Amino acid sequence: MAIVSAEKFVQAARDNGYAVGGFNTNNLEWTQAILRAAEAKKAPVLIQTSMGAAKYMGGYKVARNLIANLVESMGITVPVAIHLDHGHYEDALECIEVGYTSIMFDGSHLPVEENLKLAKEVVEKAHAKGISVEAEVGTIGGEEDGIIGKGELAPIEDAKAMVETGIDFLAAGIGNIHGPYPVNWEGLDLDHLQKLTEALPGFPIVLHGGSGIPDEQIQAAIKLGVAKVNVNTECQIAFANATRKFARDYEANEAEYDKKKLFDPRKFLADGVKAIQASVEERIDVFGSEGKA
């Protein structure tokens, strides 16, 4: 099935009580790891680029083409959406033009009426090309490539108004944050999530900041209507830990490792890339999307 819009498989997740993963990529190796995991688990997946990651990779067109070409060259058979994560209005429009198949417009830092107005414009332009759209109400705590949110509970009326713009899935603040969770974090507000899903029956909710939330809370949120869970920090930490360990081992066995030419970046980064894949596969298991392709 390969490259697709995310609308159908996210809605299928909502209708059938599981969630799909939205995994952020940063480069070629990251993308390969996510694709290998999705193919191994036969799970639909969104490969996401933040604005900063896309810039690092050479721009939206380069990032889009990298993902699409890897899907083809690796023989990937599961549904893959190429998704913009937390995009400003101008970035959303650019991604629509260069061939992303799913867009998140994040206007949660704007006044509500402006957020709704711009979201509707993005929906009109994206849907004209068969591209799915995610938008956000109630800022998610933490920082995501320059968008800083203090974290709040998404107002129910704002959520209903956003859905009326025609978006396909909704990111809503329910006590979640980006990045590592502090020790004094109080957990997801599942009562508020239930109120949201009761007000929006059958509509897919997106859980941002999925890294670090206890599995039982994620699964409880899925039962209440979360159909997409974003993961980034968790994979970054897994990659960093595995790469650091390899570097320490290299330092302790430098002559041996040099003889084996383990300074080759393809070998030097291999453990880190494997750690990303393992992390993605484990998240797919938790979300319940294995075998749902």
Swiss-Prot record:
EC nos: 4.1.2.13
PROSITE patterns from the UniProt entry: ALDOLASE_CLASS_II_1, ALDOLASE_CLASS_II_2
Pathway participation: Carbohydrate degradation; glycolysis; D-glyceraldehyde 3-phosphate and glycerone phosphate from D-glucose: step 4/4
PTM comment, free text: Phosphorylated.
Top-tier EC class: lyase
Cofactor annotation comment: Binds 2 Zn(2+) ions per subunit. One is catalytic and the other provides a structural contribution.
Residues the entry annotates as binding dihydroxyacetone phosphate: 179, 209-211, 230-233
Binding of D-glyceraldehyde 3-phosphate, residues: 50
Amino acids binding Zn(2+) 1: 86, 178, 208
Gene Ontology BP term (one): glycolytic process
Co-factor(s): Zn(2+)
Protein role: Catalyzes the aldol condensation of dihydroxyacetone phosphate (DHAP or glycerone-phosphate) with glyceraldehyde 3-phosphate (G3P) to form fructose 1,6-bisphosphate (FBP) in gluconeogenesis and the reverse reaction in glycolysis.
Protein name: Fructose-bisphosphate aldolase
Phylogenetic placement of the source organism: Bacteria, Bacillati, Bacillota, Bacilli, Lactobacillales
Originating gene: fba
